[in-house]
Amino acid sequence: MIGGIEMNSEINAFINKYVKEIRNNNAAFFAGAGFSKESGYVDWKTLLESIASELGLEVEKEHDLVALAQYCYNKHQNRGIINDVIFEEFSKQKEPTQNHRILARLPIGVIWTTNYDDLIEKAFDNVQKIVDVKSRNEHLSNTLANRECILYKMHGDKNNPNDAILIKDDYERYYKAHKQFLSALTGDLISKTFLFVGFSFQDPNLDYILSRIRVDYEENPRQHYAIMKSIDRKDYESDADYDYAKRRNDLFLEDLKRYRISALVIDDFSEITEILQEIERRLNQNNIFISGSAEEYGVFTKEEAENLIKLLSARLIQDEFNIISGFGVGVGSAVITGALEEIYMHNTRINNQRLLLRPFPQGKEARVLWQQYREDMISRAGISLYIFG
């Protein structure tokens, strides 16, 4: 079981594989429009509803939404209405969903998205992690110091609606106007294992890249995964319509295998959260939160207690566990010293995965922040160890 859902062997195998890839820094994540829908932002159809109405069309009857946006541009010969729609919708303040928060906590170094919103950025900020956002060509040559993740917003950002990728002209020019993004995405698809969530695979740019990779790397392609919702009977008026949609979807999912994308089919969107939670849980099994605060150590002298803590910390690092510490008085410094000595002894690079430090805040506002700090540290740990109080 994963939470409340029955975990089939395919999903279980995927989670084991993806956790391994995350630990080896070989994982990437792709967030489509469906990833932000739970936050209250609209999907593409709803976003373009007013545009369709202005054209005398019904958005529910339109399947090519890129063409619909292009028709609006053709009519007015400018992007004014389209930009207004994007700005009006995404200027609304929304909070990251649980899925965004889990994603931000996961040690994934590369995230791609077609979304214009800033929910991923907010989620990273909430867990005090530095994310390097790339939404324009000029951003690609800049490197943010101490970044923990790169977020590629390949269709632009809500703050620059005029540059957002939405109409046919944008897609047709993308290979030339944004070839740097295509090159970066191609490299990641070749070298990393992707998990696609909330993505429909109707994007012409991604289709182009996947086709090229399939041809160029046919002998040894990278395996990717996509969480896809099953076809629901209640969404269709008749059994015949449902059977047709299901048959077409089955053929579509089978076709994804040509690009080495395995579909993980779920019945309810809540299962996305439970799968992400299980990924985080398995990752955290190797993370140990060591806490304690002491001025006296009972039957131990101060030197004996510190040596014990240092030996424990060093042995945990030696056995491939990761340590999380809040730098508690009388305990935290020994935890850090033991871990660092073991890391340096083996010439290993220090990073937030091996040793994550979250010193507790001091001063008048400390109490306000303490709860947030505790929740952040404990959420990253699979085991909690309390020493000397």
Give the residues covered by each predicted segment.
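A short alpha-helix capping/helix-coil boundary motif
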Residues: N78-G80, D163-A164, I290-G292, A381-I383
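Conserved short-loop catalytic and cofactor-binding motifs
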Residues: F87-S91, F300, I323
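Short glycine-rich, polar/acidic loop-and-turn segments at beta strand-coil junctions
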Residues: A33-F35, I51, D117, A294, ...
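Charge-rich interaction segments
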Residues: F269-A294, E304-L312
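Short loop/turn segments at strand-loop or loop-helix junctions that form parts
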Residues: A31-A33, H155-G156, K229-S230, N287-E295, ...
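Acidic/glycine-enriched connector segments
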Residues: E296-G298, E304-G389
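Conserved catalytic-core helix/loop/strand module for nucleotide-ribose chemistry
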Residues: I2-N284, E342-M345
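Long, contiguous hydrophobic alpha-helical segments, chiefly transmembrane helices and signal peptides
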Residues: I111-W112, Y116, M154, L166, ...
